């Protein structure tokens, strides 16, 4: 994959998603990935900030962009237990304290769902966009209706992740 990306005639990003260990971030950066995501979303705020700052320290000198998550996008097998919407003030503080390049936020999507039966919080995304000036990312977007994907973009999302139906 990395070699294909290097040979590509169009700009290509090779991204490590949802790494929870800094060793995985180091390995991806050393291997030539151009983007990594450190996922400390299940950690308390201060611990998430701390681990994310280290990921930025590892990646930034090598020109690798770093994404992180604040709030928690749940999984279809246990969506309510681990889902926590992103607080705009917390997102603003997190972005300022960590220096990440992109921020994944939780506004109602759920990982691994082929059809989404949840209410997306478009107003929440707008409020986050007002205070966070880096690119916002939406995870767990498989099954979101096209019209809602467009609304997410209109409300400030610049990257939308989906993979469940591609597996």
Residue ranges and their predicted role:
Residues 165-167:
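Short, intrinsically disordered, charge-balanced linker/junction segments flanking boundaries
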Residues 1-11, 18-134, 146-157, 162:
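Alpha/beta enzyme core
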Residues 138-140:
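Thr-Gly-centered strand-to-loop micro-motif
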């Amino acid at each position: 994959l990395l070699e294909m990306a290097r040979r590509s005639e169009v700009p290509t990003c090779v991204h490590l998603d949802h790494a929870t260990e800094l060793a995985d971030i180091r390995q991806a950066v050393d291997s030539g990935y151009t983007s990594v995501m450190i996922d400390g979303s299940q950690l308390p705020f201060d611990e998430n900030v701390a681990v994310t700052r280290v990921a930025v320290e590892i990646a930034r000198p090598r020109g690798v962009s770093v994404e992180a998550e604040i709030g928690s996008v749940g999984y279809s097998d246990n969506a309510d237990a681990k889902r926590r919407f992103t607080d705009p003030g917390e997102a603003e503080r997190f972005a300022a304290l960590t220096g990440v390049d992109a921020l994944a936020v939780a506004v109602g999507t759920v990982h691994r769902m082929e059809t989404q039966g949840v209410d997306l919080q478009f107003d929440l995304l707008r409020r986050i966009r007002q205070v966070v000036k880096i690119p916002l990312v939406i995870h767990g977007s498989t099954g979101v209706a096209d019209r809602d994907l467009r609304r997410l973009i209109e409300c400030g999302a610049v990257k939308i992740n989906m993979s469940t139906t591609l597996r």
